């Protein structure tokens, strides 16, 4: 690769990650119109996520969930001074290009929307806009970081008001990082090989359909022109960085099921850099009070007396849903 191109790519990645660091320690709220966006901004949100419907309503509506209408995103962008993010479908590069052209501050390649590509996520390094992506475990997180995500969030189980899956994902990532820190570099290389395997799915499917052995050649491109070995080498470098840092090398937020100030405080206590709140604000009985309380809870997560005061007279939280009752598990979308 051309030396200047490498320098430019690294500079772009620094800029993208720099934006993510600007929202660190804050709350990002899902909004569906200008009025909700203003409520979020007044409550102290560091950014808003523009959607057509909040996840609880997406879940209820069923069908195919797509990127929000351009007019809706523009209306929200015009209403607030804080950064505006928007979601595209997993693997839907055209939706992402439209969002980038609109000038959104960050793109969420989101499992909350119906996936567009059954094999791959977007190669995010081709974009100038930063991306945030969900992850259930360290393998998913590292793959998204390798593809160019500037920020990671837990997937949780969006639209349920149930924090259990977000907690599961935080624990899985954190424990896997501790395991990586105890490993030799040789053992970590083996983990990198395992984490790179999902990129082989398309190649193996085509080989199987063609009656050929499920294996790839050393120089055979499998994703965006990269060979399996090239992907392994890059993932290995990310894992070595994680071993050194003791955490992900990008900002890591909680998302999926945050419905109360206590939920938000729990996520911060578990080491998260901030919190996304989807349905939890505008499906509560008093959105302005709940929004302000969750922002305060993130700011004072380690002060129980303050949390107790914050939690007074904020109305009813959204009605929660048991995970085992769900017909659709959004967290399982993606690779």
UniProtKB/Swiss-Prot annotation:
InterPro entries: Aldolase_TIM, PdxS/SNZ, PdxS/SNZ_N, RibuloseP-bd_barrel, Thiazole_synthase_ThiG. Pathway: Cofactor biosynthesis; pyridoxal 5'-phosphate biosynthesis. The keyword ATP-binding does not apply. It comes from the Archaea. One of its GO terms (biological process) is pyridoxine biosynthetic process. This is Pyridoxal 5'-phosphate synthase subunit PdxS. Homohexamer. In the presence of PdxT, forms a dodecamer of heterodimers. One of its GO terms (molecular function) is pyridoxal 5'-phosphate synthase (glutamine hydrolysing) activity. It catalyses: aldehydo-D-ribose 5-phosphate + D-glyceraldehyde 3-phosphate + L-glutamine = pyridoxal 5'-phosphate + L-glutamate + phosphate + 3 H2O + H(+). D-glyceraldehyde 3-phosphate binds at residue 171. D-ribose 5-phosphate binds at residues 30, 159, 257, 278-279. Belongs to the PdxS/SNZ family. It holds the Pfam family ThiG. The active site is at residue 87. Catalyzes the formation of pyridoxal 5'-phosphate from ribose 5-phosphate (RBP), glyceraldehyde 3-phosphate (G3P) and ammonia. The ammonia is provided by the PdxT subunit. Can also use ribulose 5-phosphate and dihydroxyacetone phosphate as substrates, resulting from enzyme-catalyzed isomerization of RBP and G3P, respectively. Its EC number is 4.3.3.6. The gene is pdxS. It comes from Pyrococcus horikoshii (strain ATCC 700860 / DSM 12428 / JCM 9974 / NBRC 100139 / OT-3). Keywords: Lyase, Pyridoxal phosphate, Schiff base.
């Amino acid at each position: 690769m051309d030396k200047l191109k490498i320098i430019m790519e690294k500079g772009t990645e620094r800029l993208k990650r720099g934006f993510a660091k600007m929202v660190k320690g804050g709350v990002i709220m899902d909004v569906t119109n200008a009025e909700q966006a203003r409520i979020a901004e007044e409550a102290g949100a560091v950014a808003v996520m523009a959607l057509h419907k909040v996840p609880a309503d997406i879940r209820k509506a069923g069908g195919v969930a797509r990127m929000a209408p351009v007019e809706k995103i523009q209306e929200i962008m015009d209403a607030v001074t804080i950064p505006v993010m928007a979601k595209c479908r997993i693997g839907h590069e055209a939706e992402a290009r439209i969002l980038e052209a609109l000038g959104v501050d960050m793109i969420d390649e989101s499992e909350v929307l119906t996936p567009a590509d059954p094999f791959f996520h977007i190669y995010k390094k081709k974009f100038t806009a930063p991306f945030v992506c969900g992850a259930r475990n360290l393998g998913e997180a590292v793959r998204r970081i390798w593809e160019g995500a500037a920020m990671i969030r837990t997937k949780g189980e969006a639209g349920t008001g149930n924090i259990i899956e977000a907690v599961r994902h935080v624990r899985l990532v954190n424990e896997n990082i501790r395991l990586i820190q105890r490993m030799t570099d040789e053992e970590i290389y083996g983990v990198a090989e395992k984490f790179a395997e999902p990129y082989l799915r398309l190649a193996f499917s085509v080989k199987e359909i063609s009656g050929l052995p499920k294996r790839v050649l050393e120089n055979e491109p499998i994703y965006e022109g990269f060979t399996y070995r090239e992907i392994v080498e890059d993932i290995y470098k990310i894992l070595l960085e994680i071993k050194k840092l003791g955490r992900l090398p990008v900002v890591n937020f909680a998302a999926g099921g945050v419905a109360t100030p206590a939920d938000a405080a729990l996520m911060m206590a578990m080491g998260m850099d901030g919190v996304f709140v989807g349905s939890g604000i505008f499906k509560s009985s008093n959105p302005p009070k709940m929004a302000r309380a969750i922002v305060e809870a993130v700011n004072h997560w380690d002060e129980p007396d303050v949390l107790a005061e914050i939690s007074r007279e904020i109305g009813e939280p959204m009605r929660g849903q048991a995970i085992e009752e769900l017909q659709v598990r959004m967290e399982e979308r993606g690779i």
